[in-house]
Curated annotation (Swiss-Prot):
The gene is pfdB. Its main location: cytoplasm. GO terms for biological process: protein folding. Keywords: Chaperone, Cytoplasm. This is Prefoldin subunit beta. The keyword Chaperone applies. GO terms for cellular component: cytoplasm; prefoldin complex. InterPro entries: PFD_beta-like, PfdB, Prefoldin. Belongs to the prefoldin subunit beta family. Molecular chaperone capable of stabilizing a range of proteins. Seems to fulfill an ATP-independent, HSP70-like function in archaeal de novo protein folding. Pfam families: Prefoldin_2 (PF01920). The keyword Chaperone applies. It is found in: Cytoplasm.
Length: 113
């Protein structure tokens, strides 16, 4: 039994959406990991009594003022938080569309039997 063209099209859309959703979730996870690393770095810097810290740049460590590095890290944290929020919104929209397509496909497959 061959599936109607509209059902085949919905299956393709469903599979593409599934791949996109996985990619969004993966990217969000990557940004969340970076965010946690940045927050941990700031936390560790605050524990340090020194006014200077070492920052990795191009494979070497450079001595820098702690306040400057903290400011840079804080800006990076802010950027990462925005990206994570953006990915969460995209994931939510895609998840909703995914569920709708899944329900439509189940109905279409149920009618075809």
């Amino acid at each position: 039994m061959e599936l109607p063209a509209n059902v085949q099209n919905q299956i393709m859309q469903f599979q593409q959406l599934q791949q996109q959703l996985q990619m969004i979730m993966y990217q969000k996870q990557q940004f969340e990991t970076q965010l946690k690393e940045m927050e941990k770095a700031i936390e560790e810097m605050e524990k340090s009594g020194s006014e200077e810290v070492f920052k990795m740049a191009g494979g070497i460590l450079i001595k820098r003022n702690k306040a400057e590095v903290k400011e840079e890290l804080s800006e990076r944290v802010e950027t990462l938080q925005l990206r994570v929020t953006t990915f969460e919104k995209q994931e939510e929209k895609m998840q909703k569309r995914y569920t709708e397509l899944q329900e439509n496909l189940q109905k279409a497959m149920g009618q075809g039997q």
